[in-house]
């Protein structure tokens, strides 16, 4: 799921069957519902840019579609990311797609041309001279810069700077014994929030050499998605224990918790934006 634009008036929803729906918040109704078949597997990322709908699937294929389904010269563009995908993210600020998955390291793509603009290079071998495996699980673009941060199944949080000549991460920090599942930029500069499959959520400082900081408590199941306000110190999260939570970024206090009565397999947080605790805008969906 994702917003269709910065106006946050439409929600893009991609299903496991590759069905795509667009929900308009102003009218309170679905304005689009059609299958967008490409490759194999579930949709792992969906975005919209300049009239084009973009979907990425587990088999590693990304395609741009016209909203109405008719392919134009540019609208039929297909991108082969070179391996299986866990996540596809879009930056409207730079008109760039970011992709990553198992043994398919971070890549950036120009949406206008479909050309690859950046390919991450794996970190050096570990202390035993063994290759460090690659498994990107989530991606986020840092606010106000071209830097991109990723999480991995092996507990790594890595920061890449495509504006430099280096392809390796400029910052890499590991949270021991944690399979990280999601990441979101916080309102604090160069700080991200990460969640793991065991229900651990941390604040990570990506300045200098990187530092794992605050640990937020109250989780029982694995964390599926995190959303942070761009302006206020609040963190929203959903987890496999069917709870939706809001924590304070600095005090670590659990401010709000509610359980869903819906039966579902996974609950995914789309995004949240709020100007104060009393004014919250959160959207969730359930995959049955």
Label every PLM stretch briefly.
Residues 1-13, 17-19, 39-43, 222, ...:
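Terminal intrinsically disordered, low-complexity extensions flanking WD-repeat/beta-propeller proteins
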Residues 20-25, 62-66, 106-110, 157-162, ...:
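WD40-repeat beta-propellers
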Residues 32-94:
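Asp-box/WD-like beta-propeller blade repeats and closely related beta-sheet repeat scaffolds
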